[in-house]
C-alpha cells in the first residue's frame, strides 16, 4: 500500500474513534439544556482537567508553538508562562460560579454578569461579542484540519474535503452529546497529544543532535545564542523587550480564564473540590508544550529559512526519513489539537448564542422554556455556526485573522467585571457597561495604531487601565444595584 494512504488511513481511524468516544457519553445525561450545556454538573477531576487543558490548546500548539521556538527562540516560553498563571483566577471565581449555577440554574458567564449588573443588554452584547470572536477562532481550527489532511495526502484529499471530514465528526458528537461528548473526546485527545508531543520532542533532538543538551550547545556555537537569551526575539528578529514580554504574559494570563468557552466549564464541575483541584493541577498540562518547543528548536540549524515558521513541523515530517506509522500518528495528533479546541468552541458558541442572546428577547423566552425546545435550538445554532465557520474556512476570502489580533486583549476586558461581580458591591450596571466598552475600544485603538502607545506594552494592558478607571469612577456616581442582588454574589 502507498505510504500516503497508510498515513491517511491512520488519520481516518483516529477520526472514527473520536466519533464513537464523542457520541456514547451523550447517552448518559438528561435531555435538558443543563445536561447538554453543563453535563448535569457532573464532571469529575479527570474530565475537567482534560476538557480545560485540551480545549485551550488548539492547532496553534502543534503548529504555532514549534514556529515560535524556530523563529523567536526562548520567546516561545511566553506560551508556557501565561498558561501556568492563567488558571489562578478560576481558583477564586470558579467555585463561586459553580455554586451560583447549582442554586440559580446559570450555565454561561454572561448569565452571571447580566444578573449581577441587572442588564439584559449586557447579556446580548456579550453573546454578540462571543460569537464574533469564536467563529473566526473555529474557522482557524477548520483551516488547520484541512491543511493537515491535504498535506499528508499529497493533495489527493482537497483542502475543502479535509476540513469537512474532520469537522463533520466534531459536529456530530457535539450536536448529539453536548459538553459530555466534548469532555470525553478531549480526555482521549489530550492523552494522545501529550504522548505524541513527548515522543517527537525527545526523538527529533536525539536524532539530529544526539540529545537536548547538545542541541542547545550547537545553536550557541553557530552564533545564534541570542535566540536562547530571555526574553527572546520579536517577529522581525529584534530583541523583545522585557516590558513587551511581561505585559504579553500578563494580559494573556488575565484573558486566559475569561474565554467564554473556558469559563462556562466551571458550571460543569461536580463540586468545589474538583474545581479547585483542577486549577492546582492545571500547570502540569504545560508539560505538553515543553516538547513541542523542542521540535522548533531542533529545526533551527537542520532546516533553516523555512517561511512561514508555523509550517516547520510538517516540513520536518516531510523531509526526514521517519517511519510511516509515526508520521500518521503525528498527523492524527495535529488533528487532535485542532478538534479538541474546535469542539469546545462550537459547543460554547451555540449555547451562548441561545442562552445569552435569543433567550433575552421577550418574544422568544416563553417558547424556549417549553420542554426541550431550548436544547433543540442550541443544536440548530451549532449546526448554523459550523456551516458559517466552514464557509469562512474554505470559500470566503475574508481576512479573519485580523478579527483575532486583539482577541486576548479584548477578552481580558471581562476580568474587572467578573472580579467586581463577586468582590466589589459598589459596582453598578452603568459602570460595568461603560468600563467594558471603553476597555475594548482602547484595546482596538492601540492594536491598530501602535504608534500611539506611550510605552512598549501590550495594548490590552492600556485597555484594562481605562476599563478599571471607568468601572470605579462611573460606579461611584451612578445608582447602586439592589442590595439583595449584590449579596447573592458577594456571599456565594
Task: Name each model-derived stretch.
Residues 1-492:
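Membrane-embedded helix-loop-helix hairpins and adjacent transmembrane boundary segments
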